[in-house]
Design a protein with these regions (language model features):
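Low-complexity, proline/glycine-enriched hydrophobic segments characteristic of transmembrane helices
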Residues: 42-85
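Aromatic- and glycine-rich beta-strand/loop motifs that create alpha-glucan
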Residues: 1-20, 24, 189-191
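Loop-to-transmembrane-helix entry motif
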Residues: 11-15, 195, 199, 283
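Short helix-to-coil transition segments within interhelical loops
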Residues: 177-184
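Hydrophobic alpha-helical transmembrane segments
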Residues: 4, 17-22, 255-260, 287-288, ...
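Junction motif at the cytosolic side of a transmembrane helix
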Residues: 7-10, 272-279, 348-369
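Secretory targeting signals
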Residues: 23, 27-58, 92-93, 101-106, ...
């Protein structure tokens, strides 16, 4: 425990990591200001918030505009057919799954149609919220900002781990560490300390991002609104239809689940970083290899074969969750439109990363001076 505290202290005292974290925070602040934070947008959001939550005190102009929008889009579930959504998506994307794989995707969309019928019966789609196609708050937070957050926190995690794991080589004491079994076991503490510090920096950046966003966008009395509500819906792939979530997910539940996925992704990144550094023993080379590795994995996600290998490839590719950010826990990607797909990706990718790290540790313990 004492060694762990000492290693964490090294990382938390390093000025470069704080500079990177603060720089990312400023970048998020500017992004939020651009999307929803300028004075005109904040004023409009406050006025619309009153129109959504308290019609009696709302401005007539905003109340009328909101009523017209609700009249236009408030009944989308009445005619929503998930089979037609599937057909349109296949046509637009050019993706045509065949055989048993194609039937499996069709069955997933049939289950989504049952979910649509459930939403109709329970009235889940009738809740009031900011007009989705006007403000695009869901895609702004969980798409644009969350994707930036994933990249930024990933960099912070990688830098934290590489700094501690390569500390001895940088300061010319690696020979002393590799000379004994006890010295080699120190690397496990360094890996854990690096992961904890990476989570600390990531937590600071995430909290800052959320505080700034929700300071700009009033959410009082809206946390209970389901993400599947018609008013939350936004245009996607030149189509306008609701976010059909696999379960009833209010705004606060969706935020918590998004945070869980973010932590899971950071855990995978930590394991992969440890594995690469254990193999290469050089933080500069490791950082370059990690960048190429994740970039390659991201591009691989766009390779389509039209069979079950597409699903297997996505299960073992954590960058898929980056690509689909904003569409988690709902109908989105054709291959992943089934409940729990996010956790399946985290489990499979995490298992592969841990196995790779175990191989790296085995190799590291065989190193000699």
């Amino acid at each position: 425990m004492r060694l762990l505290q000492k290693e964490c202290g090294k990382c938390l005292r390093h000025p470069f990591l704080w500079i990177v974290c603060i720089t990312f925070g400023l970048f998020q602040f500017l992004s939020i200001y651009t999307y929803v934070g300028n004075a005109g947008m904040r004023k409009e959001l406050r006025q619309m918030h009153v129109a959504v939550t308290d019609e009696e005190t709302a401005s007539p102009e905003y109340e009328s505009a909101y009523a017209d929008y609700k009249k236009t889009y408030g009944g989308m579930y009445d005619t929503l057919d998930m089979r037609k959504i599937l057909e349109q998506k296949e046509k637009k994307s050019g993706y045509e799954p065949q055989g048993a794989w194609g039937m499996w995707i069709v069955r997933n969309y049939d289950r989504l149609q049952k979910r649509v019928e459930q939403i109709r019966k329970t009235g889940e789609g009738t809740y009031a919220f900011y007009p989705g196609s006007w403000y695009k708050l869901h895609s702004t937070l969980y798409g644009k900002l969350w994707k930036k957050l994933i990249l930024q926190t990933a960099v912070l995690m990688i830098l934290s781990m590489l700094y501690l794991m390569d500390y001895e080589r940088i300061y010319k004491t690696q020979d002393l560490v590799l000379a004994t079994t006890t010295g080699k076991k120190m690397m496990e503490k360094k890996m854990l300390a690096g992961a904890l510090c990476g989570l600390f920096y990531a937590g600071l950046l995430t909290v800052f991002t959320l505080l700034v966003f929700f300071a700009a966008v009033p959410f009082q009395n809206l946390w209970h609104v389901p993400v599947a509500a018609c008013m939350v819906a936004e245009p996607r792939l030149q189509m306008m239809y609701p976010f059909v979530t696999f379960w009833r997910l209010e705004q606060w539940r969706y935020l918590l689940l998004a945070l869980v996925v973010l932590v899971g992704l950071l855990g995978i990144i930590a394991a992969v970083t440890a594995a690469v550094q254990l193999f290469l023993q050089n933080s500069y080379f490791s950082f370059a290899v990690l960048g190429l590795l994740f970039m390659g994995a991201y591009l691989l996600g766009y390779v389509q074969m039209g069979n079950v290998w597409d699903l297997i490839r996505e299960f073992f590719n954590p960058t898929v969750l980056y690509a689909t950010s904003g569409g988690w826990f709902m109908e989105n990607d054709l291959c992943l439109s089934f409940a729990g797909n996010e956790f399946a990706v985290l489990f499979c990718s995490g298992t592969a990363a841990v196995c790779l790290m175990a191989v790296g540790k085995r190799r590291y313990h065989r190193l000699e001076v």
